[in-house]
């Protein structure tokens, strides 16, 4: 994971976010040789995700590679029709549980979703980091985007139909869900798009391509309202640290397909979801939290007061930080508060 920006890119990002007083706290651009296991977990299981999914998730469905059309370095999750561990198909799923988690802020992800046709179910989402302690649905689930729902089958709108959702409850059969589906004006598959969620103590809003279309309303909005029952109190459940998840499921309850022979999306070979980058921004208020191993290790300070060019570690890469106290560990440079800037 590299946290390296050209000065021009950093200024552009800062200018975009300053209007809402958000500052970049985490950038995952997937340019390393392998996935950073200090931050990411690769899931290995064939349990169906609680949704009767068909795939076996394993390491072979996850890699860092170049997206062939754009040349972008990406996290690649690939769904494949093949026999493996008693299943007829495989895929990839990753998460940051127990490693990188945060409370409140803005999260953006630039993703190229596969052609879902009938049968693929790609998603980018998050759950409460207390999952191991309280389980689902008590931990809360927020789906920033899911594609591939059966409602679009037969309408020719699979590439434009998606939803955002929230789920919480006391047990599996007592779940409160709030899901909003939309048929978008244009296709969101097979090219890169930016999915955004703005999460505050009082609300959650989700946007598609907010950078290119700032005038568009959120496709999902929810107020985080209190409730007398703590298991359903959205202000409490969705006011705790969350980790992020990305996956490409095959079949299951969402697409309503339970036999690999009915998964038309894989008829001509594997399909992949490409994630170019993920960024988290925060405002620096007391209610926000952010935890990441690369930002929390003990580090030694170095005073760069008055130094115009700070550390030229790679040819052509210079970070300008006049008059600031930075701290450094390994390949990363941090502000004194622990926010990664390189």
PLM regions with names:
Residues 20-300:
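GH16 jelly-roll
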Residues 301-342:
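C-terminal outer-membrane/trafficking sorting elements
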Residues 19-20, 339:
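Boundary of Sec targeting at the N-terminus
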Residues 13-19:
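Sec/Tat signal peptide C-region and signal peptidase I cleavage site
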Residues 2-10:
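Sec-dependent signal peptide recognition
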Residues 4, 290-294, 336-341:
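Enriched but not universal
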């Amino acid at each position: 994971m590299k946290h390296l920006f050209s000065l021009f890119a950093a200024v552009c990002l800062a200018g975009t976010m300053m209007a809402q007083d958000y500052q970049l706290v985490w950038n995952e651009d997937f340019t390393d040789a392998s996935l950073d296991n200090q931050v990411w977990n690769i899931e290995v299981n064939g349990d169906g995700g609680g949704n009767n999914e068909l795939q076996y998730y394993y390491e072979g469905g996850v890699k860092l590679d170049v997206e062939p059309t754009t040349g972008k370095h990406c996290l690649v999750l690939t769904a494949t029709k093949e026999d493996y561990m008693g299943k007829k198909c495989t895929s990839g799923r990753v998460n940051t549980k127990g490693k990188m988690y945060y409370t409140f802020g803005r999260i953006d992800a630039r993703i190229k979703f596969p052609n879902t046709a009938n049968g693929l179910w790609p998603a980018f989402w998050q759950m409460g980091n207390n999952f191991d302690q309280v389980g689902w649905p008590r931990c809360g689930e927020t789906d920033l985007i899911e594609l591939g729902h059966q409602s679009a089958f037969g309408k020719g709108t699979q590439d434009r139909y998606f939803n955002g959702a929230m789920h919480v409850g006391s047990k599996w059969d007592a779940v409160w869900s709030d899901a909003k589906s939309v048929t978008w004006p244009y296709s969101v598959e097979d090219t890169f798009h930016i999915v955004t969620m703005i999460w505050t103590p009082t609300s959650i809003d989700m946007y598609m391509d907010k950078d290119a279309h700032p005038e568009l309303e959120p496709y999902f909005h929810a107020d985080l309202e209190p409730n007398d029952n703590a298991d359903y109190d959205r202000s409490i459940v969705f006011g705790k640290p969350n980790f992020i998840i990305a996956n490409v499921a095959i079949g299951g309850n969402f697409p309503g397909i339970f036999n690999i022979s009915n998964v038309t999306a894989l008829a001509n070979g594997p399909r992949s979801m490409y994630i170019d980058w993920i960024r988290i921004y925060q405002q620096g208020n007391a209610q926000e939290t952010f935890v990441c191993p690369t930002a929390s290790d003990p580090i030694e300070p170095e005073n760069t007061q008055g130094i115009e060019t700070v550390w030229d570690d790679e040819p052509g890469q210079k970070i300008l930080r006049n008059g600031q106290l930075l701290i450094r560990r390994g390949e990363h440079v941090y502000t004194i508060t622990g926010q990664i800037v390189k």
